Amino acid sequence: MSAQELRDKTPDQLRDELTALKKEAFNLRFQQATGQIENTARMRQVRRDAARVKTILNEKAAAAANAEA
């Protein structure tokens, strides 16, 4: 998911997306531990997508704080 697509979402949608990514990362870790994972690159992609979502959430929070001040 691109950063621009994420910036168009609301903070609630971003939190939902982050929750889904964390669940997927959890499942991928279990698949790796049991040797069932097929696409190991997906772990990296999920981890980076989660970081991207967190970054944009922080940007939106900072923008809201600056708007209030």
Curated annotation (Swiss-Prot):
One BP annotation, GO: translation
Keyword Protein biosynthesis: no
GO cellular component, one term: cytosolic large ribosomal subunit
GO molecular function, one term: structural constituent of ribosome
Record-linked CDD domains: Ribosomal_L29_HIP (cd00427)
Stored InterPro entries: Ribosomal_protein_uL29, Ribosomal_uL29, Ribosomal_uL29_sf
Record keywords: Ribonucleoprotein, Ribosomal protein
Xref: Gene3D superfamilies: 1.10.287.310
Pfam families, per the entry: Ribosomal_L29 (PF00831)
Highest rank taxon of the organism: Bacteria
HAMAP family: Ribosomal_uL29
Entries under PANTHER family matching the protein: 60S RIBOSOMAL PROTEIN L35/50S RIBOSOMAL PROTEIN L29, LARGE RIBOSOMAL SUBUNIT PROTEIN UL29C
Similarity remark: Belongs to the universal ribosomal protein uL29 family.
The name this protein goes by in its record: Large ribosomal subunit protein uL29
Species assigned in the record: Jannaschia sp. (strain CCS1)
